[in-house]
Amino acid sequence: MKNQFLNSYFQLITTIFLISSITIAAEEITSTLKVPNGFKVEIFLNNTIEKPRGITSDQDGNIFIGSGSTFAYFVTKNRKIYTIAKTLQKPIGIDYWDNKLYISSVDKIYVVKNVKEEINKSIKSHKDYTWKMQIFALLPKNNSQMHSGRYIKVDSKNNKLIVNIGSQHNVKIPPKKEAVILSINLKTKKEEIVAFGVRNSVGFDFHPISNEIYFSDNGQDGLGDNIPPDEINVITEYKEHFGFPYVFGKNQKNYGFYNKAPKNTKFIPSIYELPAHVAPLGIHFYRGNNFPKEYINKLFIAEHGSWNRSSPVGYKITTLDIDSKTRTARNYKTFLYGFLKHDKSKFGRPVDIITYYDGSILFTDDFGNKIYRVYYEKI
C-alpha cells in the first residue's frame, strides 16, 4: 500500500514538473518575441502539428491547417485537433469558403463539399476519422520538387480559386504554365492565367476595398546578399507579366536573361521592393476589430527568412500601408520579431497569417511546429 502511494505521488510530481517545464518554455518563447506596445503574443498550438503552413478559418472559430508533410488538420476554437487527411503530397495550401474546404497537393486540388458535416463526424468519432473529399482540379506536375507546393486562396467575389504554379528552377525561362498564377472557376472549373513571370508566390490576398489581388514573390538565389529584392505586387489586369526571369523588382534587368525576353513584352514593376532573401510567404490584409484602427486593411507579411545569405534576414512579421486607389505601398515596418537570435540561430519561421474570428491574428511557424496568436490589450 505504501509503495502504491509513493508511486502515485512520484507520478503526480513528475506530471506537475513536466507541465511546469512546458509552461515555462512557452513563456520564455513568447517573452522573446517582440511586438508593439499593447500587443500580446501567445502560443496557440505547440508542437502538435508537423510543419504547419497554410491556415484558414470559418465564422465559428474553427481552424483548418495545411502542412509541409502529408497531413491536413481541423482545430476547434477550444484547440482540440482532428485529422482531415493523412496521405496528401505537401498540402501547403488550404482555404475555407461557403461550407467548402479547398486543399492543395503538388498536382491536385481537393474539395470537401460539406465542412459542417465533416466537423460533426470528427467530433463524434472516437477513432481517427479522415474527411470525405473529391478531386476539384488537376495541376501541372512538378518534376524537380523545387517550389512544388501550391498556395491557394478563394476569390469569393468572383467565384474563383487562385493558385500559384512556381518555377521548377532557381532561374530559367519557364514553359507557359509555369511561374504563373492561375484562376479556376469554382462552378465551371475553367482555368485562366492570372499573371505571368511570377517566380514563386506563396502568399496572396484580396484588398478589402478594391478586391484586387496582391501577392508576394520570392527572388532568385545566387546573385549576392542584396539582390534581387523580394517583391510585393498587385494584379490590375489578368495576364500581365511580372518579370521573371527577365527583370526583377522595379524592372531591373536580369543580365543573361533580359535579352531573351519575348519582344514587346511589358513588364509590371513591383509596388514594393522588400530586402533581398527575406522570403515573403503569406500576406494578409487585417480585417478584424481587435487591433487599433490604424491596422485596419494594413498588409501583414510573413517573412520566412533567408537560408543562403552571409548575414540572415527576415524571420519576422512586417507590415505595409497600401493605398487601394493609387496602388502604392509605404511605411514598411517590423511588427513582430525575435525568432532570429543574436548568435544567428533561429527558433521560428513565419509562414501564413489570418485574421481570427475574435479579431486577433494567427500565424503558422513550420520550423518550430507552432501556431501563434497575436492580440491587442488596451494600454
Swiss-Prot record:
To A.liquefaciens L-sorbosone dehydrogenase. One of its GO terms (cellular component) is membrane. Its main location: membrane. It is found in: Membrane. InterPro entries: 6-blade_b-propeller_TolB-like, Glc/Sorbosone_DH, Quinoprot_gluc/sorb_DH_b-prop. This is Uncharacterized protein BB_0024. The chain crosses the membrane at residues 9-26. Keywords: Membrane, Transmembrane, Transmembrane helix. It comes from Borreliella burgdorferi (strain ATCC 35210 / DSM 4680 / CIP 102532 / B31). It is a single-pass membrane protein.
